[in-house]
């Protein structure tokens, strides 16, 4: 696989996702970091996004609920370069019916090389990193070259 680069801008597009048992933890984290998050564009799966918006007043672009396709919608945005980082508080102790969607979402975040926090400690490290407020170059798959190679 060949790679190219893209710039994650200073004003980031952040996906916020949480499993049911983790929603309160994500709400608490968003509340703690509300001031910093106001400078960025927020996206979320349906229930999580509506909870964040109603509890914090922050504007959130909400997708469908995760089990109804929201995880896949966020994954599509990642593939299109429209999400710069993801905070995904997932519950490793409880299986969810849409587990394949969850795995696909995490796979796409890895393929497209975006920062991902899956717990509060990592989310704190991300938001407090000097890079959080700066434009950052990341390596991403060179899809055009990939497509050309596949069509040979």
From Swiss-Prot:
Top EC category: lyase
Binding residues for substrate: 19, 23, 45-48, 65-66, 98
Catalysed transformations (reactions): dihydroxyacetone phosphate = methylglyoxal + phosphate
One Gene Ontology CC term in the entry: cytosol
Record CDD domains: MGS
Catalytic residue list: 71
Cystine residue pairs: none
SMART domains xref list: MGS
Gene3D superfamilies: Methylglyoxal synthase-like domain
Domain MGS-like: 6-152
GO molecular function: methylglyoxal synthase activity
Record keyword ATP-binding present: no
Keyword Coiled coil found: no
Assigned keywords, A-Z: Lyase
EC numbers for this chain: 4.2.3.3
Any single biological process term in GO: methylglyoxal biosynthetic process
Membership in a protein family: Belongs to the methylglyoxal synthase family.
Cited function: Catalyzes the formation of methylglyoxal from dihydroxyacetone phosphate.
Full protein name: Methylglyoxal synthase
Organism annotation: Pectobacterium atrosepticum (strain SCRI 1043 / ATCC BAA-672) (Erwinia carotovora subsp. atroseptica)
Encoding gene per record: mgsA
